[in-house]
């Protein structure tokens, strides 16, 4: 497993904008990486099986050594428990995709913090301004975005961005007489245009 350095830059900026200390941020990053990677050597601020199977951890378990499939799995990481979770969870997502990119054409006026985190020098005020003046048709690439906001300093990319989506949330509901059933699926389309189900939950029958 190779950590995605661009995603780490974006994560660090979100934490900075949310007034999370550098130490706490480094703990979150290292604990996430240790949970995913296959080795048993903890990083500087990380934790491995010796902690997760030890007496100080209420949930006795081993690190999964795989990527996260749902946001709730992050609750296994000590740095995200308690007040940290309440403070940060709305700004987080989790998909088992190392090259995950955010389609900025889907962002809304309330996503200024996320948008700001994707560029090294983009201020929160400028991010809010851009999203308030974002065309309904979106942009086709970075050059078009930059040309439309030439007075704004973006800096370098500090996250992976896209202008189209390849992850979709499909919700279905069926009813036969008195019986109802529903499902919720996350579907990921790779470059070969084939769809792969990342997760699926059923309710009802």
Regions found by a protein language model. Name each.
Residues 1-205:
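Compositionally biased linear targeting/interaction segments
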């Amino acid at each position: 497993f190779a950590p995605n350095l661009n995603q780490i830059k974006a994560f660090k900026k979100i934490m900075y904008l949310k007034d999370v200390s550098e130490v706490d941020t480094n703990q979150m990053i290292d604990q996430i990486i240790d949970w995913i990677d296959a080795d048993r050597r903890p990083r500087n601020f990380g934790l491995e099986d010796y902690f997760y199977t030890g007496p100080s951890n209420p949930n006795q378990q081993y690190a999964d050594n795989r990527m996260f499939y749902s946001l709730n799995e992050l609750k296994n990481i000590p740095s995200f428990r308690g007040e940290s979770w309440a403070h940060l969870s709305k700004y987080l997502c989790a998909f088992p995709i190392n090259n995950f990119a955010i389609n900025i054409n889907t962002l809304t006026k309330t996503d200024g913090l996320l948008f700001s985190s994707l560029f090294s020098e983009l201020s929160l005020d400028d991010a809010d301004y851009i999203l308030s003046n974002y065309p309904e048709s979106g942009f086709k690439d970075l050059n078009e975005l930059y040309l439309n906001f030439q007075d704004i300093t973006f800096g370098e990319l500090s996250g992976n961005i896209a202008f189209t989506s390849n992850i979709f949330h499909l919700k279905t509901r069926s009813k036969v007489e008195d019986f109802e059933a529903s499902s919720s699926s996350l579907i990921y389309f790779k470059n070969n245009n084939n769809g792969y189900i990342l997760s699926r939950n059923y309710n009802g029958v």
